[in-house]
Regions:
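Right-handed parallel beta-helix
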Residues: 312-323, 359, 379-390, 402-417, ...
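Extracellular beta-rich repeat passengers
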Residues: 150, 155, 162-164, 327, ...
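Short glycine/acidic-rich loop motifs that flank beta-strands on beta-rich extracellular proteins
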Residues: 79-80, 298, 325-331, 370, ...
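Extracellular beta-strand solenoid repeats
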Residues: 69, 76, 82, 96-98, ...
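Bacterial N-terminal signal peptides
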Residues: 7-16
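Bacterial N-terminal signal peptides that target proteins for export
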Residues: 1-6
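Boundary at the C-terminal end of the N-terminal hydrophobic targeting segment
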Residues: 18-20
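Extracellular polysaccharide-degrading/modifying enzymes targeting complex plant/algal/animal polysaccharides
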Residues: 24-377, 382, 428-439
């Protein structure tokens, strides 16, 4: 009788318990093992494949969710981690990839074998001779790895530059017809023979990166010409171009990436085609002991679904993502329209007007920036308590048809582009001023929550990027984030420069703390919007420390900036130290209430990241 009761109780208990599937991964594991705590896999890819097989076969491990546990250590990725519809979980059985300690998913490789450089090299500045160290670039596949980013002891090093970081010089002339920029003749000799020289051009709210083709010195001035395709783009697109004769002077520039410019500690240069790396160590850096990492991947994770078969219910928790590249400017240059979106073509219209916008005087076609984490055609793809750092371009990008997803309590720092990007910015053959209104509304990103994230020191490669950027989106909430130390705008919502209906609506920018913005560029806003977004709200934010960008050509930077055709917003209780706002050709349906220094102190103090 007792045995019968025990058996019955066990069966009832078994039916009431929801079992979960656990998979363990360690950098010291083995993919031929079982993926258990005692015998973990080595790669995350193997763990995800195991989870995929459990779901395909509907084994008992699926019932309570699948948890992939990452042990301490660095998981160097040789290829992008690809997550597909077959990896989907459900609301009752999600797939969770979580770090049990300090787990890092890295797209980098280590550089070793550093030696003092003792050879004679006439291009090196005299003051650095005897101070430079060299190493050979590793081979990835069948060629030397080429890169534009490098980190020494977890600190970003700078490419060899004409001036110290952040310093520029005013140009003399910008000639559209001849496709030339005239600059003061550099003090450094031999730059006309520099094979990989680039010019960074400061142009209002964006930058251009132009590969130098030739330099012709005429006394105190030097005329610079550039390679294609960027030369045509730079001189044909009207917005934004450099300014000559601005209120505060001409636009500025800086030359980078030649051995003759390697004159400051913390700078480096990579030779081509040998791949040899030259580095000028900072004080207290021992190159015999230093950890030097360069990126080999541009994209760490790609979550790729469709409207018909979305990826669903995948979550990353407490994971660090590091070391991604941004290489395209080395082969194509980089000329942007706004927000880091590079131009494919752009020009001024001799006769203004499109059917969608009668006053339009230019057209532009754009491409999306590269991203470390890409998400498409998905729902319930969440990042919780993660860290994103040491990245060349965008951090996380919810690109297309992403819904019901959250980025929560995460940290974004040392990122070359935008920290968080979401929504459609129509690219390729879709002209960027035409309203994006897809036949299937599910193509719009919607119901995304971005909250309690720290975003700081981003936009450090492409200064025209932003802290958080959203294009054509609806029902998006951006709340209680802290965004600081960005070179252009803090939080930007909207695209298209249009008063026409597009599907953008019901967006909320609430209780964020934005400070130290517009550090290098201007025509910026701590909070910035574009186009018609009915039912949208901007409230209870704190915006301060608007930086006086040192090379701006005018004073156009604002705490709140409603740029062209912004409409449908209620703006209330946003604290800033003065009412420095701007509305550029807004629509008629914006409602402004109390904003500025009169806003209650309680609202000011409660903006930003909430305590757990």
């Amino acid at each position: 009788m007792n045995k019968l009761l025990y058996t019955l109780a066990f069966c009832l208990f078994s039916q009431s318990v929801v079992w979960a599937g656990d998979i363990w991964v360690s950098p010291t594991g083995n993919d031929n093992d079982e993926g258990t705590l005692e015998a973990p896999f080595q790669t995350i890819e193997k763990a995800i494949k195991q989870a995929r097989e459990w779901r395909r076969l509907q084994t008992p491990e699926v019932n309570g969710g699948i948890y992939i546990h990452l042990a301490d250590g660095i998981y160097y990725q040789e290829k992008t981690l690809f997550i597909r519809p077959e990896d989907s979980g459900t609301s009752q059985s999600p797939t969770v990839i979580e770090a049990d300690g300090e787990a890092v998913i890295s797209g980098g490789v280590q550089i070793s074998g550093w030696k003092p450089f003792t050879d004679f090299e006439p291009r090196l500045p005299n003051q650095t001779k005897g101070k430079i160290w060299v190493a050979e670039a590793p081979s990835v596949g069948n060629r030397h790895l080429e890169f534009r980013q490098m980190w020494v002891n977890d600190r970003k090093a700078q490419r060899a530059s004409q001036f110290a970081d952040g310093v520029m010089e005013r140009m003399i002339n910008f000639n559209v017809q001849d496709e030339t920029i005239t600059i003061p003749t550099p003090l450094i000799q031999g730059l006309e023979d520099a094979p990989l020289l680039e010019m960074i051009v400061h142009q209002r709210w964006a930058i251009a990166i132009l590969r130098v083709r030739s330099m012709e010195t005429k006394g105190d001035s030097t005329v610079v010409r550039f390679h294609e395709p960027e030369s045509h783009l730079e001189f044909s697109h009207p917005w934004p171009q450099p300014v000559i004769g601005g209120e505060k002077g001409n636009s500025s520039f800086c030359l980078v990436n030649d051995l003759s410019l390697l004159d400051e500690p913390g700078e480096w240069y990579q030779e081509y085609p040998s791949g040899r790396i030259y580095y000028y160590p900072r004080e207290n850096e021992d190159m015999n002991q230093a950890t030097v990492i360069v990126p080999a991947l541009e994209n760490l994770v790609f979550v790729d679904g469709s409207l018909e078969r979305p990826v669903q219910y995948v979550k990353f928790k407490n994971v660090r993502f590091e070391h991604t590249a941004w290489n395209r400017p080395s082969s194509e240059g980089h000329v942007t329209l706004q927000g880091g979106f590079r131009l494919l073509d752009a020009y001024k219209l001799a006769t203004p007007g499109l059917p969608e916008k009668a006053t339009l005087e230019n057209q532009a076609w754009i491409a999306r920036p590269e991203a470390a984490i890409r998400v498409k055609g998905s729902n319930n793809i969440d990042f919780d308590g993660c860290t994103f750092q040491h990245m060349g371009a965008t951090g996380v990008d919810y690109e297309w048809a992403v819904t019901n997803s959250t980025i929560n309590s995460s940290c974004f720092t040392d990122i070359g582009g935008t920290a968080i990007l979401m929504g459609a910015f129509p690219d390729g053959g879709f002209e960027t001023h035409v309203p994006f209104k897809p036949i299937n509304e599910k193509e719009l990103c919607s119901d995304i929550l971005v909250q309690d994230n720290l975003i700081t020191n981003v936009t450090n490669e492409d200064w025209g990027c932003v802290g958080i950027g959203a294009g054509y989106v609806k029902n998006v909430t951006i709340s209680h984030n802290e965004v600081s130390h960005v070179n252009y705008s803090g939080i930007c919502v909207g695209w298209g420069w249009t008063l026409l209906e597009s599907g953008m609506k019901n967006n909320c920018i609430e209780a964020n703390y934005v400070h130290h913005f517009a550090q290098r560029l201007y025509d910026a806003g701590g909070l910035y919007t574009l186009s018609y977004q009915p039912g949208s709200i901007m409230r209870n934010n704190r915006i301060e420390q608007l930086t006086d960008a040192p090379y701006a050509t005018n004073e156009r930077a604002f705490y709140i900036y409603f740029d062209e055709a912004t409409d449908g917003y209620t703006v209330e209780n946003n604290w800033c130290p003065e009412e420095r706002f701007d509305s550029n050709q807004p629509g008629p349906n914006n409602v402004w209430k109390i904003n500025g220094p009169r806003v209650d102190e309680y609202i000011k103090l409660n903006a930003g990241i909430r305590k757990p």
